[in-house]
Regions:
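Bacterial Sec-exported substrate-binding components of ABC uptake systems
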Residues: 2-75, 189-226, 286, 343-345
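Short helix-initiation/N-cap motifs at beta->coil->alpha
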Residues: 48-49, 107-122, 162, 261-271
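Short secondary-structure boundary segments
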Residues: 66, 138-139, 161, 285-289
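A short, structured surface patch at a secondary-structure boundary
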Residues: 70-128, 133, 253-256
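Extracytoplasmic ligand-binding site segments that recognize negatively charged/polar headgroups
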Residues: 91-96, 142-146, 154-186, 219-246, ...
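Alpha-helical, coiled-coil/dimerization segments enriched in small aliphatic residues
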Residues: 116, 237-266
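Proline-aspartate-enriched helix->loop->beta-strand connector
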Residues: 123-136, 271-284
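Structured C-terminal subdomain patch of bacterial secreted/periplasmic proteins
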Residues: 174-185, 189-191, 198, 202, ...
């Protein structure tokens, strides 16, 4: 996502728009929580996925769309501006996100399930909440399309990692964990919460660097990242274009799943391909739809040959929270956790 002011008040203002240039339009901004007022320049334009969305004033009533949307709003320092959240698949966040959310009141949590029922929010409710922005991955179609939101005075903004699934021909690099703190800085500039966003982004960068440093000391092992989505026996995996791949890279794990595989586009994976690859390590993500490690292991053990793989034989089966699969601070936390667990084995 790139940002730019949509007007030029003066030459110097244009050059410093996102660094705190004050303009007459900024005087009309809405205040929200400890992050406002400020001297950021509005209106701005956010560019993402080939779209361009005008943000007329400092967002004060934000709806978090999907796990990525909610987590990034928190990381950008704007949790106190959320009026509602939806589409989160029912799993808890890690401490950095969950603790912040629990400290706040008044955020409407729209019920959402897992599996095919991703959970949504009615457009009528969006209007009732008087939202001025919906940010996140769970939008882009129907009433929640970028154009329809804009026609109703609501800025619909998506993180760049959502582009591939929302717009034909768009691409997203999920494995690039460095893009996570970079986007938080951009989001902080858009929401005028730059100080907190930059501090959180710097902490993420330090944690990621530490994970890579420690991970570089580990032996290279073959691994597969797996998960179950619902009560069926359909098994899903993480290919090369996933945050799990970025986590694997930090931990010196070689992904045995075909690089081109993407669960969103290809559906369930053949369990036999995992067995044949004989991974040294199995990473199992849990949490969404109420899926537990015990439940996942029970299903995996029914797959012919799975218990004979090196991962089962050597008891190298590691659980990560489902949040690890999303390009948020939780993926960076998971990288550190995985490196730590591998070092202990």
């Amino acid at each position: 996502m790139t940002l730019r002011p949509s007007f030029l008040a003066a030459a110097t203002c244009a050059a410093l728009a996102l660094a705190g240039c004050s303009t007459g339009a900024a005087a009309d901004r809405q205040s929200a929580g400890d992050n406002a007022p400020s001297n950021a320049a509005y209106p701005m334009k956010a560019s993402f996925c080939g779209q361009e969305v005008a943000v007329e004033r400092e967002p004060a009533r934000i709806i978090g769309a999907g796990r990525e949307g909610v987590a990034n709003i928190v990381s950008a320092g704007a949790a106190d501006r959320m009026v509602a959240r939806f589409g989160e698949h029912g799993a808890l966040y890690g401490p950095r996100i969950e603790d912040e959310l629990k400290s706040l009141s008044g955020i409407e949590e729209v019920a959402s399930g897992g599996g095919e029922d991703h959970g949504s929010i009615s457009f009528e409710r969006v209007l009732e909440l008087q939202a001025d922005m919906i940010y996140g991955s769970a939008l882009g179609e129907g009433d929640l399309s970028i154009d329809n939101l804009g026609n109703n005075g609501i800025a619909g903004v998506m993180p760049p990692s959502s582009c591939a699934y929302a717009f034909s021909g768009a691409k997203s690099d999920f494995a690039d964990l460095d893009a996570i703190p970079a986007h938080i800085r951009e989001l902080g500039a858009l929401l005028n919460t730059g100080e907190r966003a930059n501090a959180n982004a710097s902490a993420m960068e330090a944690d990621l660097a530490a994970a890579r440093e420690e991970g570089g000391k580990l032996p290279e092992l073959k691994a597969a990242g797996l998960y179950y989505w619902d009560s069926s026996d359909d098994l899903f995996a993480y290919g090369a274009n996933s945050t799990i791949q970025g986590i694997f890279d930090a931990a010196r794990l070689k992904n045995v799943v075909a690089p081109s595989y993407d669960a969103m586009f290809n559906g369930a994976i053949s369990p036999e391909t995992i067995v044949k690859s004989n991974p040294d390590v199995l990473i199992i993500t849990t949490g969404e739809s109420g899926i537990t490690l015990e439940d996942s292991l029970a299903r995996l053990e029914k797959i012919p040959g799975m218990t004979q793989t090196a991962a089962f034989t050597n008891k190298r089966i590691i659980e990560l929270p489902s949040g690890a699969a999303y390009p948020t601070v939780e993926a960076i936390d998971a990288a550190r956790e995985l490196v730590k667990k591998l070092a202990q084995q």
